[in-house]
Amino acid sequence: MQIPLSTFEKKFLSLYFLIFSIIPLHATEMVFDRGIASINIEFANTLNLRKQGLMKRAKLNQDSGMLFIWPEKEQQCMWMKDTSIPLSLAFLKDDGMILEIFYLEPFSKSSVCSSNEVRFALEVNRGWFREIM
């Protein structure tokens, strides 16, 4: 299910992060119009890491997420095959601004695709964005 964002939220709801980190887990801060939230990000910046994603994990720490990085900007699609954790997914612009957020259902094989061409997506525990915004 897609969470609608108002024009105000799309304009001011920004996420800043280090994009090309060689460290697989990196603590970073996300800047929103209502304040700053810290999150530990795992980077999925290779084909194998993007394919694996968060599959076959029992849990995801509340302050953690996975940033998917594709080499080219295009419409991206995600699914929840073999993923038991309820997640929220944000597709991001190059500058980190959140374009759209979706709720993902565990084990779903239905694809959720970005409405725009993107290079980045962030998966976190379901409801995390709502809690910090």
What are the functions of these language-model segments?
Residues 4-5, 20, 44:
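A general, composition-driven signal for non-globular sequence regions
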Residues 9-10, 33:
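Short, intrinsically disordered low-complexity segments
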Residues 23-27:
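Sec/Tat signal peptide C-region and signal peptidase I cleavage site
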Residues 28-133:
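Compact, glycine-rich, soluble single-domain proteins
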